Amino acid sequence: ADEWGIDSSQIVACGSSAGAITVLHGEYALCNASPLVQHLPAGFRYAGIVSFAGAIFEMGEELVWASQPAPMMLFHGDADANVPYNVIRESGVGFFGSKYIAGQLRTMNSPYYFYSVENASHVIATAPMDDNRDAIDAFLSKLVVDKEPLMIETDETTIGAPEVRKDFTLAEYIASNFM
């Protein structure tokens, strides 16, 4: 960071789909002092996280945050068949999606911006990069740069749109990604 003149306290991690899963896992590992983050400089923290259709996979029934996470912006469609929107648990493991994470952040009084799109599929892994730049700019300006202690939730619904399937099994999530 020093060599390139980068202020490491202003790094925002962003990812889409598997990349969103990666950045969310990175922040979760930092918050829980996981051995996976030992190679990072002492005290390193992200300034913010932007996740387009991401989730956290955890060997346990709940996510447990040992410290307050960076401000997060979470985009997700509630009919995503690739990455869970809310949570799916099976055999003592959980796959925790954006809705679930947003609920935890609200309970923790941690700054976040959750943008939920009704009846939207995994298209939310890419669409907001074009369609929601103003919302992303607002998140970066208010929650990251100005450090405003805000919890923002936006629910986008298309009037008259037909309902689509929203309940998927773990096997269906796996099949949609690997088969």
Model-derived regions: residue spans:
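Gram-negative outer-membrane beta-barrel domains
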Residues: W4, S16-A18, A81, G97, ...
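Extracytoplasmic/secreted proteins, especially bacterial periplasmic and envelope-associated proteins
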Residues: I21-H25, R45, G97-Y100, D131, ...
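Primarily recognizes the serine-hydrolase "nucleophile elbow" in alpha/beta-hydrolase
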Residues: A1-Q68
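Hydrophobic anchor at the start of a short beta-strand
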Residues: S8-I11, M72, P111-Y113
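Short beta-strand/loop motif that positions the catalytic acidic residue
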Residues: M73-H76, D80
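C-terminal catalytic histidine-bearing segment of alpha/beta-hydrolase fold enzymes
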Residues: R106-M179
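A structural motif corresponding to the C-terminal end of an alpha-helix
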Residues: W4-I6, A42-F44, I101-Y112
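Conserved alpha/beta-hydrolase "acid-adjacent" motif
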Residues: A81-G97, A125
